[in-house]
From Swiss-Prot:
Keywords of this entry: Ribonucleoprotein, Ribosomal protein
Protein name per Swiss-Prot or TrEMBL: Large ribosomal subunit protein eL34
Family annotation (HAMAP family): Ribosomal_eL34
Gene this protein is translated from: rpl34e
Gene Ontology MF annotations: structural constituent of ribosome
Length: 88
């Protein structure tokens, strides 16, 4: 029986074969879902997905695209926002 904390499905079960021939279960935290555009819901490019402790280690330029609304809107939706701002 696994430990109580590993019974939850927030852990991914990885089955590993040991050199002795036994199969053991390793528990690993699942990866977070991809970031999506606030406008259209498409997955964003250039935004890494990982647990907070992994993202913390990255430099600022690797965390999100370096442009206005980077990491929030996809390029096509950002273009629409720029046009709307310029016209108003």
């Amino acid at each position: 029986m696994p430990e109580l904390r590993y019974r939850s499905r927030s852990y991914k079960r990885i089955f590993k074969k040991t050199p002795g021939g036994r199969t053991v279960t390793h528990y690993r935290r699942k990866k977070p879902s991809k970031h999506v555009c606030a406008g259209c819901g498409k997955p964003l490019h250039g935004v890494p997905r990982g647990r907070p402790y992994e993202i913390r280690k990255l430099s600022k330029s690797k965390k999100r695209p370096n442009r206005p609304y980077g990491g929030y809107y996809c390029s096509s939706c950002a273009r629409k926002v720029f046009k709307k701002e310029a016209r108003s």
